[in-house]
């Protein structure tokens, strides 16, 4: 018997083992049946890595002391929102932000010892990961021409130094607002009258922490009209508005002074606030004079509204007849939804919301480093949905470029230009290569 024949069984076993391993890895990364297996493995990795970050890397003192100083003034009885301030300046966040950090102030053993707060933010970080995983999973339900969002998209969510820093080392309010917002997206995806009402409640609570949630509002208006009709849209907006009025009630009713109402809203929702040029991440390549100019602000607002209008008109109603048909049906039957849910894929809701936010990021007057959390968890979803121009290599290149810009501190002319180019490429990609209206053949396959 030859040596080759003796070794052939072992060789066959080795090839079989390699083939089995490759199949297992492929299933863990792409097979919907193994979505939560992979998500859980990544979750465990995030737990270990995050604990290591908290243990090994010092907390960064930026806004936490100012938050606590603002809380001190609130607890001391100050109810004029315009007078509440800390070492970094006046309080510019809505009331729920103040209440959350008041809870930290009350419940933590010491506001000087931030380690317990870091573990709370670790909880926020892990909850955000689970929430976004749920959004990806629900978006991948194979119905109405939709398709699976593979769990390989979750891997980039674990690779950002900036994201870990924002959540675990700096204790900003941005992650809290985004976690509540992601919970609202899940409620919208679950759907039904109760789901949309709960989603609007959660959306408003997120807005009550930070006004960046307004970036998602144009997309939400479109979705409310599509899924809930005119009456449902009015109901949803009423829920959001009522909560925004109830949250600051302690400031309104402490004294019979109408000025306090105006002081709250002009402080918590100050659209005219000037940003410091030294902290900008996305506009370093222009002069400070141009950065602070009113003309630039007006131009950016006009561009923002124009692109939102284009997406609303041509991209956000992926049904036969498009936006005109949706509008016609909505206004002719205001009590019912303006489109058939069976006509749109499961990813429609997060895609509209996330793309509206990305447009806001593109035209933002300034982005600071903590604003990275406003869209970081959405990027793999958007790139897979067309922002990567339908090409894996392009998607990876855009993601790496954007992350490099955020990881470089302080920002430079080149990193700001790269970030703006990355945002522009993603918005154009979504518009020209975004997921198209499912064809009749796709729908029949989905059934």
From Swiss-Prot:
Q: Which GO molecular function entries does the Swiss-Prot or TrEMBL record give?
A: dol-P-Man:Man(5)GlcNAc(2)-PP-Dol alpha-1,3-mannosyltransferase activity
> What EC number is given for this enzyme?
2.4.1.258
**InterPro entries membership:** Glycosyltransferase_ALG3
GO terms, biological process: protein glycosylation
Side of membrane Lumenal, spans: 1-34, 105-118, 192-204, 254-296, 365-379, 433-447
Q: What is its main location?
A: endoplasmic reticulum
EC class:
transferase
The cross-references to Pfam families, in alphabetical order and at most eight, read: ALG3 (PF05208)
Q: Which residues cross the membrane?
A: 35-55, 84-104, 119-139, 171-191, 205-225, 233-253, 297-317, 344-364, 380-400, 412-432
What are the subcellular locations of this protein?
Answer: Endoplasmic reticulum membrane
Q: Which domain of life is it from?
A: Eukaryota
Reactions listed under catalytic activity: an alpha-D-Man-(1->2)-alpha-D-Man-(1->2)-alpha-D-Man-(1->3)-[alpha-D-Man-(1->6)]-beta-D-Man-(1->4)-beta-D-GlcNAc-(1->4)-alpha-D-GlcNAc-diphospho-di-trans,poly-cis-dolichol + a di-trans,poly-cis-dolichyl beta-D-mannosyl phosphate = an alpha-D-Man-(1->2)-alpha-D-Man-(1->2)-alpha-D-Man-(1->3)-[alpha-D-Man-(1->3)-alpha-D-Man-(1->6)]-beta-D-Man-(1->4)-beta-D-GlcNAc-(1->4)-alpha-D-GlcNAc-diphospho-di-trans,poly-cis-dolichol + a di-trans,poly-cis-dolichyl phosphate + H(+)
Residue intervals on the Cytoplasmic side: 56-83, 140-170, 226-232, 318-343, 401-411
How does it sit in the bilayer?
Answer: Multi-pass membrane protein
* Keywords of the record: Endoplasmic reticulum, Glycosyltransferase, Membrane, Transferase, Transmembrane, Transmembrane helix
The entry's function note states: Dol-P-Man:Man(5)GlcNAc(2)-PP-Dol alpha-1,3-mannosyltransferase that operates in the biosynthetic pathway of dolichol-linked oligosaccharides, the glycan precursors employed in protein asparagine (N)-glycosylation. The assembly of dolichol-linked oligosaccharides begins on the cytosolic side of the endoplasmic reticulum membrane and finishes in its lumen. The sequential addition of sugars to dolichol pyrophosphate produces dolichol-linked oligosaccharides containing fourteen sugars, including two GlcNAcs, nine mannoses and three glucoses.
Protein name (database record): Dol-P-Man:Man(5)GlcNAc(2)-PP-Dol alpha-1,3-mannosyltransferase
């Amino acid at each position: 018997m030859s040596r080759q024949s003796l070794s052939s069984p072992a060789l066959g076993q080795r090839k079989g083992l390699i083939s089995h391993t490759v199949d297992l890895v492929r299933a863990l990364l792409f097979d919907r049946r193994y979505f939560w297996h992979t998500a859980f493995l990544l979750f465990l990795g995030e737990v270990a890595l995050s604990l290591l970050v908290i243990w090994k890397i010092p907390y960064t003192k930026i806004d936490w002391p100012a938050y606590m100083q603002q809380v001190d003034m609130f607890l001391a009885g100050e109810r004029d929102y315009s007078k509440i301030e800390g070492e970094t300046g006046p309080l510019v966040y809505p009331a729920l932000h103040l209440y959350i950090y008041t809870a930290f102030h009350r419940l933590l053993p010491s506001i000087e010892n931030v380690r317990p707060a870091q573990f709370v933010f670790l909880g926020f970080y892990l909850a955000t990961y689970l929430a976004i995983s749920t959004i990806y999973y629900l978006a991948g339900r194979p119905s109405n021409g939709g398709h699976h969002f593979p769990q390989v998209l979750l891997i980039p969510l674990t690779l950002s130094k900036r994201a870990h820093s924002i959540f675990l080392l700096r204790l900003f309010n941005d992650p809290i607002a985004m976690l509540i917002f992601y919970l609202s997206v899940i409620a919208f995806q679950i759907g039904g009258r109760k789901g949309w009402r709960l989603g609007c409640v959660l959306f408003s609570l997120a807005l009550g922490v930070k006004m960046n949630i307004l970036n998602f509002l144009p997309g939400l208006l479109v979705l409310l009209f599509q899924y809930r009709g005119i009456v449902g849209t009015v109901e949803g907006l009423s829920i959001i508005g009522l909560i925004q009025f109830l949250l600051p009630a302690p400031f309104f009713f402490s004294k019979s002074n109408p000025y306090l109402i105006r002081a709250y809203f002009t402080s918590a929702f100050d659209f005219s606030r000037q940003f410091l040029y030294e902290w900008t991440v996305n506009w370093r390549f222009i002069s400070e004079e141009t950065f602070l100019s009113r003309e630039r602000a007006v131009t950016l607002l006009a561009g923002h509204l124009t692109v939102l209008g284009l997406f609303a008109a041509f991209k956000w109603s992926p049904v036969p007849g498009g936006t005109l048909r949706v509008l016609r049906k909505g206004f002719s039957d205001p009590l019912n939804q303006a489109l058939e849910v069976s006509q749109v894929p499961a990813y429609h809701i997060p895609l509209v919301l996330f793309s509206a936010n990305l447009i806001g990021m593109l035209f933002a007057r300034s982005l600071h480093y903590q604003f990275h959390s406003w869209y970081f968890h959405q990027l793999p979803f958007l790139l897979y949905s067309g922002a990567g121009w339908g090409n894996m290599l392009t998607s990876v290149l855009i993601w790496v470029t954007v992350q490099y810009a955020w990881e470089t501190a302080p920002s430079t002319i080149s990193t700001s230009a790269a970030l703006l180019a990355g945002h522009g490429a993603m918005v154009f990609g979504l518009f020209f290569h975004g997921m198209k209206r499912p064809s009749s053949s796709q729908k029949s396959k989905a059934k």
